[in-house]
């Protein structure tokens, strides 16, 4: 059984979906998030450590993100880290989506993505953007299925947008 207070340093919202699933919304704890990113680095289509400064990323996510954590049967199953601080543009940005290997195939990313979309609506944001590789077919198709459209395609690296 996980302690959500180890994962999130602040909890803004709690959505109990059923007796086995809860989505928590808040700021990720720095130590947890860094450990999580490094532990799951090779799960990403292109490992994060090879393309970003992990410490700077962890600090930015801790400081600026709204993170959605799905807990299923007492275990952290996945998360989405997003930014909703650009009030003038009314545009959010998903910076990281991840479902732990042992929880894949259960449509948990769909649950998290719907929570992010509902959050955007609730704070009157008009758009959510994200970057994804077309070759990362599971992620690319997930976003298409949930109404994201390709805005730009730079050699297979796509900027996608969802509009409320």
Language model features: what each stretch is:
Residues 100-111, 123, 134-141, 145:
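Conserved glycine-rich acetyl-CoA-binding loop
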Residues 3-13, 126-137, 144-164:
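C-terminal "cap" of GNAT-fold acetyltransferases
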Residues 93, 124-127:
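Short loop/turn motifs at secondary-structure junctions
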Residues 54-56, 111-113, 125, 159-163:
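Short C-terminal domain-edge/linker segments immediately following a structured domain
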Residues 28-29, 73, 102, 126, ...:
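Generic structural motif
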Residues 5-95, 100-101, 113-114, 119, ...:
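Acetyl-CoA-dependent GNAT
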Residues 47, 106, 128-129:
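A generic secondary-structure micro-motif detector
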